[in-house]
């Protein structure tokens, strides 16, 4: 029984270790690089009407009312 117990413990340890390595690999693969994040941020800021100064005066007033009423 001692050899079987040792084998089971070793097998479970190896499986857990492999799952941890796989999870770390998947996490690393899904995280975008800093260059990608900068590109996404710049494109978002350029396309968003709040940041590219294309709001009409009425939209600015409405935004101001929204912010001041929420405080």
Curated annotation (Swiss-Prot):
Main location group:
virion
Q: Which residues lie on this side of the membrane: Virion surface?
A: 22-70
Membrane topology classification: Single-pass membrane protein
Q: What induces it?
A: Expressed in the late phase of the viral replicative cycle.
Q: State its location(s).
A: Virion membrane
UniProt-listed Pfam families: Chordopox_A13L
Q: Where are the transmembrane segments?
A: 1-21
Q: Does the keyword Cell cycle apply?
A: no
An annotated GO cellular component: membrane
Looking at the keywords, is Transmembrane present?
A: yes
| Sorted UniProt keywords | Late protein, Membrane, Transmembrane, Transmembrane helix, Virion
Q: Which family does it belong to?
A: Belongs to the chordopoxvirinae A13 family.
* Function as written in the Swiss-Prot or TrEMBL entry: Essential for the encapsidation of DNA into immature virions (IV) and the subsequent maturation of IV into mature virions (MV).
Specify the protein name: Virion membrane protein A13 homolog
Lineage of producing organism: Viruses, Varidnaviria, Bamfordvirae, Nucleocytoviricota, Pokkesviricetes
């Amino acid at each position: 029984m001692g050899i079987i117990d040792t084998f089971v413990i070793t097998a479970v340890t190896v499986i857990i270790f492999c799952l941890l390595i796989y999870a770390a690999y998947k996490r690393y693969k899904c995280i975008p690089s800093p260059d990608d994040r900068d590109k996404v941020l710049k494109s978002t800021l350029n396309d968003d009407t709040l940041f590219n100064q294309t709001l009409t005066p009425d939209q600015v007033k409405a935004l101001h009312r929204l912010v001041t009423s929420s405080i």
